[in-house]
Structure formats: C-alpha cells, structure tokens
Amino acid sequence: MRYDPGLIEEKWQKFWKNEQVFKAEEDETKTKYYVLDMFPYPSGAGLHVGHLIGYTATDIVARYKRAQGFSVLHPMGWDSFGLPAEQYAIRTGTHPRETTEKNIANFKKQLTAMGFSYDESREFATSDPEYYKWTQKLFLILYEKGLAYMADMAVNYCPELGTVLSNEEIENGFSVDGGYPVERRMLRQWVLRITAFADQLLEGLDELDWPESVKQLQKNWIGKSSGASVNFATEHGAIEVFTTRPDTLIGVSFLALAPEHPLVDLLTSDEQKAVVAQYIKETQSKSERDRISEMKTKSGVFTGSYAKHPVTHELIPIWIADYVLIGFGSGAVMGVPAHDERDLLFAEQFNLPVVSVLNKEGVCINSCCEGFHLDGLSGEEAKQYVINFLEENHLGAAKIAYKLRDWLFSRQRYWGEPIPIIHFEDGSCRPLRDYELPLLPPEIQDYRPEGVGQGPLAKVREWVQVFDTETQRAGKRETHTMPQWAGSCWYYLRFCDAHNSAAPWAKEKEQYWMPVDLYIGGAEHAVLHLLYARFWHQIFYEAGIVSTPEPFKKLVNQGLVLATSYRIPGKGYIYPEIAKEENGKWVAPSGEELDVRQEKMSKSKLNGVDPQILIDEFGADAVRMYAMFSGPLDKNKLWSNQGVAGCRRFLNRFYEMVSSDRVKEDNNFEGLSLAHKLVQRVTDAIEKLSLNTIPSSFMEFINDFVKLAVYPKSAVEMAVRALAPIAPHISEELWVLLGNSPGVQKSGWPSVLPEYLEGQTVTIVVQVNGKLRARLDIMKDASKEEVLALARESASKYLEGCEVKEAIFVPARLVNFVV
C-alpha cells in the first residue's frame, strides 16, 4: 500500500476536532501536566518553519503525556495587541481588529495543518474584550495595592510613531519598527512598582528549572548591589550619590549628574546655561543603551558649580554626563578615575585629576585626613569603616541598590487595553468598578497620536470627557493604553479557565493546573516577558489568588532556525530561487556577486520557508519529524528542505513495513526486542527533550526490523504507538490499518519489559592485532569455542596466510587475534 499524506492528514485532523480528543479536563483521578508555548503575535507574515520548532516540541510532549495517562492542558492563543497592527491601520485605515482577525485565521490554518494537539476550546486573543476586561481588573489590583502610579519619567519618545518606546524597541537611536529617530523626553506616565518585588524576583530564581543563562540575565537585569549613599553638599542642597565602592571615597575628583537630574537647572551657572542646554538637547536623541555603551570617549559638560567633599571638604567640580542614568541609583555618580574605567575615560577627556587611593593589592593608600584613617584597610573592612564614618556624621548610610527600575507601563496607542481610570481637575482619580469593565476603546477613523505624549484616544472628546455619576463630578478618561506585555503577563492563568465570565479564573481550576510544567519559547523573552509575568504572579500570590509563588516550573528556549540568505551588497536581499551559482560563486540575475550567509529565518531577509509549501509536498508528519531531526531543541540549526524529503522517505518505508503481509500474530523474540528497545529510546528522548535523536532511533529500528522474515504484530503496534507523538497522522492511519479502533492515543504508551531490553544476543567486536575488522551478533549463551569459530570466519580474509599466535577472548565484548 502507498502512503499519501494528502489523503490522510486532513481526515485525522477532522477526527481529532470532532471527537474533541485534546480537550483538557480537571480530572482529580489523574496527574495533571500543563505544557505551554509562548503564544505568538499574529503578524501578517504568518508562520515560517522557524516558528514550528518549539510548537512541535511541546506537541510531542503533550501527546506523549496524554498517552501516559496524564490530564494534559496544551492550549494556544494570540498575543494580539501591538504596534504593527496599529501602524498598518495608520497607513491603510483598516481597523486593527480586522487585520488581527484575518492574521489569526491564517495562523490557525497553518497550525491546524501541522496537526498540533491544542485544546481549541480554550483559545482566546488578548484583544478580546472578554479577556482584557480581566487584564483591566488585574491592573486595578496593582493600583489598589499602590503598585501602579503616575510619574514624570524620562522616556524614549518617537515623534514619528507618536509613542513612548522601551529600550528594546530602539536600535542605535532609531525605532526598530520603521527606523524613525527617537529622543528622550520627560512625560507623565503610568509606572508599575516592580522594584518592590526585586528581592522576591531574585530569590525565586533558585527554585526554577530554567537555563542558567536565563537566570543570570534576570539576575543581571535586577542588578542587586550593596554599597553606600553619600551626600555631597552644594549651595542648592545635597547631591546624593550611590556607590558600591565607599572605600574609594577619598579618590573622588568630580561628580557627574544625569542630564535629567532635578538639580541641573539650579546648579548650572549663568555662564554655562547655553552649553548645558545644548548638551541636554543632544542627549535627548540618544537611547539609554547608546548612552551606556562602551565607547572610547565620553561626553559631558561642566555646570559651573562645585560640591563639598564630605571628608576632605575640598571643592569638587560638578559635571553633566550622558553615561549617568537618572533611573539608576540617584542619577549621580562620584568620579573616581584611578579605579573606574568609565570615570578614567571621562577624566582624560576633560583633564580632571586622577587620584590613586588603592594599591595593586586593593589596600587603601593616600586616604587619611583629620578624623578619618583608612590607610592599611582593605575589602569589606575598609568599606564598613567608611559607612560607619558617614552614618556617625550624618553624611550618608549603608544602602542596597538595584539596576531594576520601575516598569514604564503607558503607551500612546489605540490598539491596546484602555487604562480603567478617570481623572479629575483637582488631581485625584477614580478606578473603574467591576461593573464598568471592560472599558472599550471608541471606534475611530484616525489612528495617529494626538500631540506629544497623547495617544489617539485623546482626540475622541465625547469618549474622554465623562460625568462620573459615582462622585457627581466631571472627569476625563485616561487616554494612555497598556503595553503589549500586559496581556501576556497572565495569559497562562486564563488558559486554566478560559471562558469564565465571573472571574479571571476559578480558584479550584488554577489550583489544579498551575504551575506550568513545561514552557517553551524564544530566548529573546529571557528578561522582559518572563520577568513581568513573574512580577504579576508574585503579586497575585501575595494577594492569595494563585496557589504557587512562580508560574513556570521548567523553561526551555528553542534555538534559532537558520537558512541561507542572498544579499546584493549595498542593495539588499533577493529571493533564494533567483540566485544562481556560476564558477563557484553565487550571483544575482543582474550578474552582481552575492553575499551568501546562514542567518535567522525572517521576512526581511527573504529566507523564511512557508511550512504549507512543505506540507503540500512532503506532508505535515515529515515536516514535524525533520523539525526535531534538524538539531538539538535548544541549539541553533540550519534548515534543509532536503532533510524534510529524507524524513518523508523514512515514513514511506515505515508505512510499507506496517502494511506488509509479513505482519503476523507472532512472538518472535528479536522483533519484540527491537520494538521494546525503540520504545525505551523514544521514552528517554522525550523525557530528556533530546527530541533530535528520535528520528534516528526509528531509522535504526526499521533497518533492523525489515530483515526479519516475520513482523510480530504486537511489535509493529508498539512502534506505531511510539511514533504517534512525532508523526501523529500516519500513526492514526496505521493504527486502524492494523485492525484497531480509531484513536491511537487511547491505547496508552507502550510498556517496556526488561527481558526484551536485555535480548538473547550480544554484539561483539572482532579485531586483528587490535584493529577492528568485524562485528558479530552472537547468542548470549554461546560457548567460547563457538564464538572463536564465528570470529575466525568473519575475519578470515585478514587472517589468510598468517599464523595466529594468540586469540584473546573477552566474554560478550571482543575477540582479538594476534598474528
């Protein structure tokens, strides 16, 4: 019989859907298993095969766990708010909802074609009012706890996009989306007090089965450091400086303030006002990332003012420097150029003194004055001496600081969750009540922002201006919206109870499913999404509305999928199908030589591969199989369509084997042993997520199995059941072909018996003078004489004409003929 995926795959997809095979149930008699993908933003470009690596891995695990008898939750939804749909609306006038719904339909079609086993009954999009009603409610929980507040913040503002951008949305001073200039501005924004949870976020990492690299990234992002705050007196009040090296205090030769520091105006002398203003203007065009980059030179400007050193009482010049950030520490640093590389670059740039106060061993020198004797001390002893001095003289204190800053939560966009707050003229505000949610955005025609720092909602006066019946006052709705991160902070909880209209989730359902047992997604989310989700979850845990302190038990980052790209230097990328190889070089149709690279699949590089094209040619099961075979799950891998073709050839062979008339009711030990060993290898591979080894295990199995004169039916059934998580369509078809009722998953995961793993034969190596010459499969109970005779026969051409001086025999291991 012939294997034709085009005939069987859609049939079995309909069967799974009609029978609700993948519907998750809260069955208290079963152990639960929650396996989750980082849900996608439904872009217009659709999925390419690079997206399928993680999705295929989670699907294999979900199908395997169901077969083992677990109650499995494996859902999919859509992170559907976001800037791309809004930018498309600005260009075309198409409502973001319309664009999003169209893109979701395309994504669903692609995912269905791959045979992924999602519980479709739990599907939602973050832009569904039924969903973001609860996002708004959860935001108000943060607000009521004092964790959401408004503040004037120095932000990355893009005039062209008309919105605030995060550091991650900027590259080299330009927006990632569109490549528009970005500048720094002070704007009033909503902020979430994530710093209040800095210690919990750090401590919680120790309990997680996550990649160490991700844990370290989060630790670095939080950036906990111990030190001291030091007050430097000026005519306009003290400048507070945080330092991790109080032992170098005597070496301070300048202070540097962030351009946004509140004392800049007061400290700038009349003579310096013009140059300071120009410098601050130039700084506004730089992102924070640009400002702290490791550059050979540092920029700055003198304020014209001085501060008094708290120990020596000397006057120290006060500068403004863009490498100082207002959000870290106090927005001021003490310059110790002898012992800090950045400070040294700055001092050399502006001819400032360099005073050494530590020797090569780290012992304090040149650090004594009246009432202050630091010389000879080092390390923690020296630091503590300085802290004690500062505290006794009311000049500072011990302090712990964090790099982590409160989360800028506002966006000046339309396509995001409206913030459910009403503002009044006296500066007070009122959160909306539950019965007023969801707060829906108005229908608008113009999606462009309204002036600096105001989103498009600000233009809809009849929506903004309200009479609040609760307070009997006129008020204004908040016109900022939430960032795309908001919906993804808690979506994993909604999947526990996706269509609850009375609460974001029922407590008993959250208790049953949480935490997520396996979470797979890209490493690009190592910090922001994962940190923000952990932050919200820990708030919910403290509030008693979730049962676990952490949301994601085990995390795996899938590697990137690379594909060949072809670029005309200085012009751009071309499609692979029009590139030609001539005389060992790749050229464009114009004859221009191409720069050929292996790069991450992307729409911009024109090297993405549409999975539907491969499905149409080879079948979804072959694509799924190669998606795993292409390399270890967590490593980068190079995609090859030829590899998909190879997996299709294997499936052809597997189909022929199972449908062969050699399949009999037989207890052939060798056949059963091969099947049991296969199941054991596949089981181990799934448990360890070494999924790339599974296809080769099957290929080795079939190579040995087809040598049998008779195929034991029970062994064939074991192989089909073991293949089902990886290639589910063909497995369903073959399961029925073998005379079973539809639904291979219901048959359970095959059990492995030890006696079949051990087998009745053993493989030994045959050597001549220590060189491998043959391998032999022999019966375990074969005598030494039998083994030597078989070994001599297998190596006969190497022994011909030679005198065998000795035959070294190691039972069940080897025979070595010494000639």
UniProtKB/Swiss-Prot annotation:
GO terms for biological process: leucyl-tRNA aminoacylation. The keyword RNA-binding does not apply. Its EC number is 6.1.1.4. SUPFAM superfamilies: Anticodon-binding domain of a subclass of class I aminoacyl-tRNA synthetases (SSF47323), Nucleotidylyl transferase (SSF52374), ValRS/IleRS/LeuRS editing domain (SSF50677). One of its GO terms (molecular function) is ATP binding. It comes from the Bacteria. Its main location: cytoplasm. Pfam families: Anticodon_1, tRNA-synt_1_2, tRNA-synt_1g. Keywords: Aminoacyl-tRNA synthetase, ATP-binding, Cytoplasm, Ligase, Nucleotide-binding, Protein biosynthesis. ATP binds at K603. A motif ('HIGH' region) lies at residues 40-51. It is found in: Cytoplasm. The keyword Membrane does not apply. It catalyses: tRNA(Leu) + L-leucine + ATP = L-leucyl-tRNA(Leu) + AMP + diphosphate. GO terms for cellular component: cytosol. A motif ('KMSKS' region) lies at residues 600-604. Belongs to the class-I aminoacyl-tRNA synthetase family. PANTHER family: LEUCINE--TRNA LIGASE, MITOCHONDRIAL, LEUCYL-TRNA SYNTHETASE. This is Leucine--tRNA ligase.
